[in-house]
């Protein structure tokens, strides 16, 4: 606790030798008073030593020669004090206690009080020789000398105070013992309680400051002058100085090199900027502050130097490039009006040392937490560049909760508000008033006044609250807002953290049901340790499922556990056995008759327990069948059900594992002179099947409009025989539910669907929500479209691009709600009726999200086996959101990923991040619109590499026809194919030399043979030092299928690398780390035995740029308990 108000002076320091005679002082006092100072601190008041050091006093009764007076020093001080008082000022005097000039009368009269330094090195060192010859130091090693000096200085300071000295500055007080100061100042204040004494200790180390903490000083000088305005030491020094006395800051040195000297090489405006910054920083951060004479005009002449340079000082004043008198007056006025700038309060630095600007908060009291108001100081340490202030960084956890700010206003009540981001000019310093925001109190007003009628209601609610905590349920998507995705036949592993107060045993279960069921199924959870619980639930039906987690206190298990522990410790358990008997009896009286078998077991147990002697009851209570009976009767104390019900979408395998082949059926004739038909496609089915594909995907097969039809290579003028883009859907022949007449009839399409199924292929159709200007809907439903003010249609645009052959319906046009939505849903249902269950949706990110959520849910409610592929090459957030809304799978950025690091990062995001629960990537190597630059002019081996990457990294991959022929001719500086099939018919020689159909077939065969390759999950990247080789492993959750894949990323040169298998693989098998493995090459029918975790692979792109091994423990390898952890995270593993 502070015993008196902080000493917070506004000091102006004067070197007496530079001011001049006594008659020169009144004009100085007048100016200083006008600037708002309340004290003038005088240094060099007394006659200096022969060598001229002003702090080495030669005669305490003689003033400095510069006063030009016959008065003694005390009388001169009295005259100065009287003159200062006339201007509202008080005089403070600097005194030096620990040393005197050797010619000082006190030294002559009392040699035992002092010691002189006669060491040779002190005399030889030119930096200290003059000082050593000039001075005598107090004999601090002598108690008698210290007592005598204390008496002398007590009388001396008293006499100076009588002469008008209102405060004293003690130079280097740390040179005298702290206890000596405490006794001296205590005695001095017995006579003059209001006489402040300042410790002149700037730049002193922590130990010196700590020693003076109890010495009794009223104030102490800080080291602000030398702070870089960044480092945290200033705040730490302030904390220590507050224990010594109120910190006094100064913008410039009152002895030693001046600020103007530091910046002497800078431009005049920079020097002024430095002075202004120093001024406001000192005024804001000191309890008191001191301005050395000449600072206001940027004078560089040193004060308190051995040789006074009065003429140079006056010349510098006369030629000063700036005058800060007005700013000084403003600072003094602000300090007088602002308690937070005058208190000996806490200063907190709110920004780090490397922040662009430094922000500090200071209060007036002991701690900011207890201050009513504070001041925010923001300063730019850079004199050349502005700095931005980010409140979010500066105010995080702000001490005292000060979050309302306003500029300091003269006499007006400021309007406080939140701190907005702002910029500080170069070298600027800004001060803001700070207040706390009113804390949030939610208790009713009558409760806050002490009458607490609301207490009963709140405590009643608390009593009904959930005693058991259920947290961190997984897997969930966005806290259950969207469904987790799984495929039919999987078991969903549900995990949760479940815990409660005390030591009672808990039990938990996962309840689940299909969305068309009313009752809940239940699976008991197993405890995995550390409050983790798990249950696996079967997913045996397609469609939406729901699950929830429940928990309860298992009183029977708790009692049995307690009895067992006490018995094992040799404690009596008779009372606990009686509790068990009563618990069983209570359950029998409450239990319903719905479970007669459990009731029978419990009745038999109760009877046996009554009849058994005490030594046999223990065995009866611990019987497992008794615990099972209690569980079956669902005696669940404090049962807690987690509020949310979490959805799960169960889809068929094609949603997670499929190999897609895209072709234009109109090119199926293999003759550019004849439009292909569905019947022509049938002839291609064996070729596509033999490459191992199972999904055959067509771009739109509907009638194509003729208005603004695009010509070859996307030209704006179409020739009469140009076929146009199939995405310009609709003509007089029909719209989205019609078949292009040249492809055949709807019956022909149905025949194709049946033929594809006979070849183990499934047809996927493109669902493109767009129309040509000739679409029947424009005449039948013009209100479904957007029209321009001139009556023209609003064509599809992606400014500045315009697609005159396409118009988009307006989902929120007045006439379109809900008719358009229903019509589009009916399009999907129409093609489902025609035998299609897979739809690739064109650009879904350009259509409203609520439509997709409704449409997919509505279709799946009728046909849960429907699969939707999202073709949304857009921002990740939108791609992920579409997946959450129900799209089964999505195109991805794989098409543009090329480097090893990119593959690792992207697969880690997809397989180990939140997206793993709902986003299934379909890795297309190319599309009719995307001819990737890494394939253009690339060798055959690059196509094999991209196919291997897509086929092994994801369970879903696809290619557009022509990829197997290594087609890559592109338009200049474009990813568009030259002579793109999107605008014309194409004929190909499917068996021409150089095709990669055989390699694709081997890849797809490896995918079918290895369940680990049928998903993107379970992947772990191995450490391989060669960045041109990607090595990874994939494992099923049960580790009953593990593959290791190595792929060269260099299509030109052979590459080789070591790689290290992850230890998690061995844990998954339940074998020792590095045990023998059998590795079966999946494309070369070669078997190897691997020893240890490190292995080697060499890949020649001209032979085979990839290797796929199925690995398993060798015969005879001992197996233990396997690590049944969740799917292996997709991260790169480094050998330790």
From Swiss-Prot:
Binding site for alpha-maltose 1-phosphate: 710, 770, 805, 843, 982-983
Gene that encodes the chain: glgE
Enzyme Commission no: 2.4.99.16
Region of interest (Maltosyltransferase), residue spans: 440-1136
Name this protein carries in UniProt: Alpha-1,4-glucan:maltose-1-phosphate maltosyltransferase
SUPFAM superfamilies: (Trans)glycosidases
Location of region: Unknown: 1-439
Keyword Cytoplasm among UniProt keywords: no
GO annotation terms (biological process): alpha-glucan biosynthetic process
Subunit structure: Homodimer.
Function: Maltosyltransferase that uses maltose 1-phosphate (M1P) as the sugar donor to elongate linear or branched alpha-(1->4)-glucans. Is involved in a branched alpha-glucan biosynthetic pathway from trehalose, together with TreS, Mak and GlgB.
Keyword line: Carbohydrate metabolism, Glycosyltransferase, Transferase
């Amino acid at each position: 606790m502070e015993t008196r108000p902080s000493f917070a002076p506004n000091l102006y320091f004067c070197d007496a030798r530079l001011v001049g005679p006594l008659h020169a002082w009144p004009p100085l006092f007048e100016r200083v008073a006008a600037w708002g100072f309340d004290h003038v601190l005088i240094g060099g008041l007394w006659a200096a030593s022969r060598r001229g050091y002003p702090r080495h006093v030669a005669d305490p009764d003689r003033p400095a020669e510069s006063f030009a007076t016959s008065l003694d020093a005390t009388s001169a001080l009295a005259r100065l004090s009287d003159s200062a008082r006339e201007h509202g000022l008080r005089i403070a005097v600097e005194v030096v206690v620990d040393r005197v000039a050797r010619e000082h009368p006190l030294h002559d009269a009392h040699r035992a009080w002092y010691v002189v330094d006669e060491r040779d090195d002190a005399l030889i060192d030119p930096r200290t020789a003059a000082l050593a010859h000039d001075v005598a130091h107090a004999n601090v090693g002598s108690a008698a000398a210290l007592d005598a000096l204390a008496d002398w200085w007590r009388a001396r300071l008293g006499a100076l105070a009588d002469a008008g000295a209102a405060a004293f500055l003690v130079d280097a007080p740390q040179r005298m013992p702290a206890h000596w100061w405490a006794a001296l100042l205590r005695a001095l204040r017995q006579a003059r309680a209001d006489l402040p004494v300042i410790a002149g200790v700037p730049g002193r180390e922590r130990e010196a400051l700590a020693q003076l903490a109890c010495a009794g000083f009223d104030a102490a000088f800080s080291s602000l002058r030398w702070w870089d305005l960044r480092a945290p030491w200033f705040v730490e020094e302030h904390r220590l100085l507050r224990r010594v006395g109120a910190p006094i800051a100064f913008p410039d040195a009152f002895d030693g090199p001046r600020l103007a000297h530091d910046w002497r090489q800078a431009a005049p405006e920079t020097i002024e900027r430095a002075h202004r910054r120093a001024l406001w920083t000192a005024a804001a951060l000191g309890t008191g502050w001191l301005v050395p004479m000449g600072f206001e005009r940027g004078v560089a002449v040193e004060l308190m130097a051995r040789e006074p340079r009065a003429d140079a000082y006056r010349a510098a004043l006369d030629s000063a490039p700036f005058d800060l008198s007005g700013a000084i007056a403003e600072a003094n006025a602000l300090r007088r009006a602002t308690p937070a700038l005058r208190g000996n309060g806490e200063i907190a630095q709110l920004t780090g040392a490397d922040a662009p600007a430094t922000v500090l908060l200071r209060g007036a009291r002991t701690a900011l937490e207890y201050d009513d108001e504070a001041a925010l100081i923001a300063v730019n340490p850079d004199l050349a560049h502005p700095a931005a202030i980010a409140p979010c960084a500066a105010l995080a956890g702000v001490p005292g909760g000060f979050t309302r700010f306003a500029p300091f206003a003269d006499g007006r009540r400021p309007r406080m508000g939140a701190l907005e981001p702002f910029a500080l000019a170069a070298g600027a310093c800004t001060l803001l008033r700070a207040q706390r925001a009113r804390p949030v109190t939610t208790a009713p007003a009558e409760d806050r006044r002490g009458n607490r009628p609301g207490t009963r209601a709140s405590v009643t609610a608390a009593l009904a609250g959930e005693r058991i905590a259920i947290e961190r349920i997984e897997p969930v998507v966005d806290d259950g807002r969207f469904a987790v995705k799984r495929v039919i036949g999987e078991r969903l592993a549900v995990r949760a953290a479940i815990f409660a107060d005390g030591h009672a045993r808990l039990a938990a279960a996962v309840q689940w049901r299909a969305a068309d069921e009313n009752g809940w199924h239940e699976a008991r959870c197993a405890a995995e340790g550390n409050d983790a619980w798990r249950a696996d639930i079967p997913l045996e039906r397609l469609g939406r499922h729901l699950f929830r987690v429940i928990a309860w206190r298992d009183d029977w298990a708790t009692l049995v556990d307690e009895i067992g522990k006490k018995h094992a410790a040799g404690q009596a358990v008779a009372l606990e056995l009686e509790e068990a008997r009563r618990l069983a009896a209570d359950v029998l009286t409450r239990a319903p008759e719905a479970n007669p078998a459990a009731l029978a077991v419990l009745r038999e147990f109760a009877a046996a327990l009554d009849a058994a002697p005490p030594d046999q009851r223990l065995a009866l209570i611990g019987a497992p069948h008794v615990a099972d009976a209690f569980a079956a009767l669902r005696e669940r104390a404090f049962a807690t059900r987690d509020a949310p019900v979490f959805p799960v979408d169960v889809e068929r395998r094609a949603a997670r594992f499929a190999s897609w082949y895209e072709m234009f059926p109109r090119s199926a004739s293999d003759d550019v002179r004849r439009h292909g038909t569905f019947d022509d496609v049938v002839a291609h089915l064996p070729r596509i099947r033999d490459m191992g594909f199972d999904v055959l995907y067509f771009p739109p097969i509907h009638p194509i409009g003729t208005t603004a039809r695009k010509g070859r290579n996307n030209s704006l003028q179409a020739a009469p025989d140009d076929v146009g883009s199939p995405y310009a859907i609709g003509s007089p022949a029909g719209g989205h539910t019609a078949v292009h007449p040249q492809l055949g009839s709807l019956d022909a399409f149905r025949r194709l669907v049946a033929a594809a199924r006979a070849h183990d292929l499934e047809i996927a159709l493109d669902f493109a929500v767009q129309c040509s200007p000739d679409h029947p809907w424009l005449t039948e439903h013009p209100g479904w479209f957007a029209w321009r003010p001139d009556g023209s249609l609003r064509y599809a645009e992606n400014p500045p691009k315009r697609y005159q052959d396409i118009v988009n319906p307006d989902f929120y046009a007045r006439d379109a709600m809900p008719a358009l939505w229903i019509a589009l849903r009916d399009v999907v249902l129409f093609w489902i009726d025609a035998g299609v269950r897979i739809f690739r949706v064109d650009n879904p990110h350009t259509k409203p999200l609520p439509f997709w959520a409704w449409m997919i849910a509505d279709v799946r409610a009728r046909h849960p086996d429907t699969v939707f592929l999202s073709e949304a090459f857009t921002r990740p957030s939108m791609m992920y959101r579409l997946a959450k809304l129900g799209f089964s799978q999505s195109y991805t950025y794989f098409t543009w990923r090329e480097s090893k690091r990119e593959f690792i990062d992207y697969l880690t995001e997809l397989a180990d991040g939140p997206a793993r629960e709902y986003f299934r990537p379909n890795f297309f190597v190319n599309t009719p619109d995307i001819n990737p630059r890494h394939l253009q002019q690339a060798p055959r081996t690059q196509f094999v590499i991209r196919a291997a990457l897509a086929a092994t990294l994801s369970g879903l991959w696809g290619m557009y026809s022509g990829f197997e022929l290594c087609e890559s001719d592109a338009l200049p500086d474009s990813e568009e194919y030259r002579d793109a099939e999107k605008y014309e018919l194409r004929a190909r020689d499917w068996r021409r030399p150089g095709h990669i159909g055989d390699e694709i077939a081997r890849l797809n065969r490896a995918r079918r043979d290895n369940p680990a390759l049928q998903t993107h999950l379970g992947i772990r990247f191995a450490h391989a030092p060669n960045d041109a080789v990607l090595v990874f492993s994939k494992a099923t959750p049960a580790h009953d299928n593990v593959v290791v894949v190595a792929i060269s990323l260099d299509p030109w040169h052979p590459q080789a690398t070591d790689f290290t298998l992850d230890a998690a693989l061995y844990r998954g098998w339940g074998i020792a780390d590095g045990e023998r493995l059998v590795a079966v090459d999946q494309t070369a029918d070669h078997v190897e035995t691997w020893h240890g975790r490190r292995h080697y692979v060499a890949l020649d792109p001209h032979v085979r740029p990839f290797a796929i091994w199925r690995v398993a423990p060798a015969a005879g390898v001992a197996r233990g308990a396997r690590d049944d952890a969740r799917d292996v995270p997709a991260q790169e593993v480094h050998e330790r």
